[in-house]
Curated annotation (Swiss-Prot):
GO terms for biological process: cellular response to oxidative stress; protein modification process. InterPro entries: Met_Sox_Rdtase_MsrA_dom, Met_Sox_Rdtase_MsrA_sf, MsrA_MetSO_reductase. Induction: Induced by phenol and 4-chlorophenol but not by hydrogen peroxide. Active on the S and R isomers of MetO. GO terms for cellular component: cytoplasm. This is Peptide methionine sulfoxide reductase MsrA. Its EC number is 1.8.4.11. GO terms for molecular function: L-methionine-(S)-S-oxide reductase activity; peptide-methionine (S)-S-oxide reductase activity. The lineage of its organism: Bacteria, Pseudomonadati, Pseudomonadota, Alphaproteobacteria, Hyphomicrobiales.
């Protein structure tokens, strides 16, 4: 298989027939956050909200958000594809359809969705389609998955605002997928808070250098 054929295969979403079968049972993962010891799974404190972000390799993306004041907990996983309960190795084949994502659970009284979206847009390149830098494939695509219509509307308005900012610098168009949140399949234990466990590990986050013009709530 040529490099071009391999590239095309990794950047095409698999059909239901092509996707790997996966498994009925979730793969084992951590119960608590390595950094703050909070539980990685629901129930969350009353009034807290959640959002899923995909912005390339999930190691660096998760570290970006767990450091934000008002973020209660983060976790990494796979979402947006076909294969149930996939492994990391399976997602790397491109035959699950899943993106690497970060679950961000936050207190909206402390940090707003707009503030989280500003970080999302500014800290990666949302114009690259099925890749992020040297990381190539559907698993590295840019995504925002929201848990209610109001948050989806906020995300879509932010995409429009950032699209205009990018266009003003001769960049774009944005390829970020914004959808209602699908099922999240938690990644393996060793991926959770990876850069806290491995401080010198790989982080592929690279922004465009264009500031996001979302007006933030005062």
């Amino acid at each position: 298989m040529s490099f071009l054929d391999s590239y095309r295969k990794k950047t095409l979403m698999p059909s239901t027939d092509e996707a790997l079968p996966g498994r009925a049972q979730p793969i084992p993962t951590s119960a608590t956050h390595f950094v703050n010891s909070r539980p990685l799974k629901e129930p969350w404190p009353e009034g807290y909200k959640q959002v899923l972000f995909g912005m390339g390799c999930f190691w660096g993306a998760e570290r970006l958000f767990w450091q934000v004041p008002g973020v209660y907990v983060t976790a990494v996983g796979y979402a947006g594809g076909v294969t149930p309960n996939p492994t990391y190795e399976e997602t790397c084949t491109g035959l699950t359809g899943h993106a690497e994502v970060v679950l961000v659970v936050y207190d909206p009284k402390v940090v707003s969705l707009d503030e989280l979206l500003t970080l999302f847009w500014e800290e990666h390149d949302p114009t690259q389609g099925m890749r992020q830098g040297n990381d190539i494939g559907t698993t590295y695509r840019s995504v925002i998955y929201t848990f209610d219509k109001a948050d989806r509307d906020v995300a879509e308005k932010s995409r429009e605002a950032y699209s205009q900012a990018l266009a003003g610098r001769g960049l774009g168009p944005i390829t970020t997928e914004i959808e209602d949140a699908p099922e999240l399949y938690y990644a393996e234990d060793y991926h959770q808070q990876y850069l806290a466990k491995n401080p010198n590990g790989y982080c592929g986050l690279r922004g465009t250098g264009v500031s996001c013009p979302i007006p933030l709530a005062q």
